[in-house]
Amino acid sequence: MIKMTQRLQTYSKAKAIGIGAPGPLDAKKGIILGPPNLPGWDYVPLKDIMEQRIALPVVVDNDANAAALAEAHFGAGAGYESVFYITVSTGVGGGFVYNKQVIKGANSCAGEIGNMIITNTGPSHPVLNKGSLELLASGTALQRAGKQQLNLQGDAGELFRLAQNGDPTAKDIIEEFINYLAIGIANVIHTVDPDIIVLGGGVMKSKDSFMTELREKVKDCVYPQLRQSVRIEPALLGTKAGIVGAAMLPKQSR
């Protein structure tokens, strides 16, 4: 990260650096606390390390918060007061933006829905809860199920392609994924009641295979009076959302 920043031609003109990093983390101190998908990154003072080497102010926040910020300002959430962004990728993360400001929580853990318990069964993990949303409805979860049940060696996209071609096992895995993700989204809706849920992350490359069913499943899981107002849309900024949001962090932190 340091070498890449120093190689940028515009580095000398920069006034600050924003970093979107996997949570959990301490956004106030810029410390990475032990993300499930970054083994060994325990209590890493990323802000201090970067500031010492780059000699510019550095702001660190959850990568999902950064993406949420970008989508709320420039993407699918633009024009809405409250936007909850969910990334479904290697893991599952979330960020809540209200009135264009990220809601971080007392310990920088607001929106950490990946560790939300969906069921009391499921694989174990050294950091995450058993039966958590991330272990059941992430790209990694799909990849794991594809490998265990179909001996697939590719990513989640391969599983979606098999399901579209009628493979019954692949279809069952995707159906389970949709059910778990729908429960997680319904829990978010009942907790913060956002204007819109925005879905991003690598799994959304296969959105055409599951978005319609996902919307219907979510409606089945919420209060009847909420069903007509459920709004779930794919992210518009794609993989750039986190980068755009990270660039916005220093200004947002003033």
PLM regions with names:
Residues 1-17, 25-31, 47-58, 70-81, ...:
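ATP-binding/phosphotransfer module of carbohydrate and carboxylate kinases, centering on a glycine-rich
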Residues 30-41:
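A charged helix-plus-loop insertion that forms the helical arch/lid used to bind
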Residues 63, 89, 246:
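Active-site glycine-centered loops adjacent to acidic/histidine catalytic or metal-binding residues
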Residues 66:
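Short, glycine/acidic-enriched loop or turn micro-motifs at the edges of active sites
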Residues 84-86:
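Conserved beta-strand elements of the Class I
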Residues 93-97:
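Short beta-strand scaffold segments in enzyme catalytic cores
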Residues 109-113:
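Structural signature of FAD isoalloxazine-binding scaffolds in flavoprotein oxidoreductases
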